[in-house]
Amino acid sequence: MTTEKVNLLDFDRKGLRTFFAEELGEKAFRAEQVMKWIYHFGCDDFDQMNNINKQLREKLKAKCEIRAPYVSEAQHSADGTIKWAMRVGDQDVETVYIPEDDRATLCVSSQVGCALECKFCSTAQQGFNRNLRVSEIIGQVWRAAREIGLEKETGRRPITNVVMMGMGEPLLNMKNLIPALEIMLDDLGFGLSKRRVTVSTSGVVSGLEQMIGQIDVALAISLHAPNDKLRSEIMPINDRWNIEAFLEVVRRYIASSNANRGKVTVEYVLLDHVNDGTEHAHELAELLKGTPCKINLIPFNPYPGSPYKKPSNSRIDRFQKTLMQYEHTVTIRKTRGDDIDAACGQLVGDVIDRTKRTKAKQFDGQAIPVKTL
């Protein structure tokens, strides 16, 4: 009988120290040495860890492994964006690398599929299967860093920012999200600034409540409508936590956070003749008066079978100018990777069981109203 090996990517620093002490009978500092090899050097071979004694290396080889998702497919956009299908178990999730002049952002998935069924999102139309483990979340960053390689060797910019905006709702996977974020921030992990790690949520209020005082990262909220009636039509989660409840906890989170510099990023996808009218812009501006924020407008990225369209440039421009009359900071997101379906809302992956919507639609014992496909 073969005993399954323990994947060390499933542990943040605290968890790894505990595992080394309690399960391996080793001093905690050894855990930190191994952690540095894993994340600073991208090492997944214990024999290469030359400051670890042979006895411990043999013990690690017998009981442990360093196993990240592997790339099953890679697509390269004309603008430099890369979309990877990362194999997790017997399924794929999608991870996107977005290079810019002064940074390189990695868009990371938190679930296989998504249970929230936002009407404009391609991922949601694929159904939900399961939450990703810590190793499958942080492993996307580990694998991407290895694929990109050193800038001097590949000419590609190393990853400077991580956004939890891939497949899934991050705050419905808190158990695995928090340790993964800790590794991103840890000096022995990827050592990213808390201002360079962003979590995006569609409005899981109870998850955001948990984050207050527990983890400090940049926050982006998927609002996408200026009133409850319209938001409930395109985002069923609004029937569980309405806009007022959502914004109230958002204000408390950013007040407790240093990473957000006192402001939250409000994401607003523009759907042609659905939520992009001048009246919607006025209503949105009034709604956000009490919430320190910057507004990021996202012109809809079409996908096959979608009932929505991208607004004309004139409608997008008019919406932005209306918001700016209220002295809001408003940007329009530049579409990246749309030629490989890697743009916002286009990620699909490979969801084997498209009917499974069980645990992930339960939060604090309350059912989130989502339809079963």
UniProtKB/Swiss-Prot annotation:
One of its GO terms (cellular component) is cytoplasm. Keywords: 4Fe-4S, Cytoplasm, Disulfide bond, Iron, Iron-sulfur, Metal-binding, Methyltransferase, rRNA processing, S-adenosyl-L-methionine, Transferase, tRNA processing. The keyword Cell division does not apply. SUPFAM superfamilies: Radical SAM enzymes (SSF102114). It catalyses: adenosine(2503) in 23S rRNA + 2 reduced [2Fe-2S]-[ferredoxin] + 2 S-adenosyl-L-methionine = 2-methyladenosine(2503) in 23S rRNA + 5'-deoxyadenosine + L-methionine + 2 oxidized [2Fe-2S]-[ferredoxin] + S-adenosyl-L-homocysteine; adenosine(37) in tRNA + 2 reduced [2Fe-2S]-[ferredoxin] + 2 S-adenosyl-L-methionine = 2-methyladenosine(37) in tRNA + 5'-deoxyadenosine + L-methionine + 2 oxidized [2Fe-2S]-[ferredoxin] + S-adenosyl-L-homocysteine. Its main location: cytoplasm. GO terms for biological process: rRNA base methylation; tRNA methylation. S-adenosyl-L-methionine binds at residues 168-169, 200, 222-224, 301. Binds 1 [4Fe-4S] cluster. The cluster is coordinated with 3 cysteines and an exchangeable S-adenosyl-L-methionine. InterPro entries: Aldolase_TIM, Methyltransferase_A, RlmN_N, RNA_MTrfase_RlmN, rRNA_lsu_MTrfase_RlmN/Cfr, rSAM. The keyword GTP-binding does not apply. [4Fe-4S] cluster binds at residues 114, 118, 121. Its cofactor is [4Fe-4S] cluster. PROSITE patterns: RADICAL_SAM. It is found in: Cytoplasm. The active site is at 94 (proton acceptor), 344 (s-methylcysteine intermediate). Residues 100-339 form the Radical SAM core domain. Specifically methylates position 2 of adenine 2503 in 23S rRNA and position 2 of adenine 37 in tRNAs. m2A2503 modification seems to play a crucial role in the proofreading step occurring at the peptidyl transferase center and thus would serve to optimize ribosomal fidelity. Reaction proceeds by a ping-pong mechanism involving intermediate methylation of a conserved cysteine residue. This is Dual-specificity RNA methyltransferase RlmN. It comes from Vibrio cholerae serotype O1 (strain M66-2). The gene is rlmN.
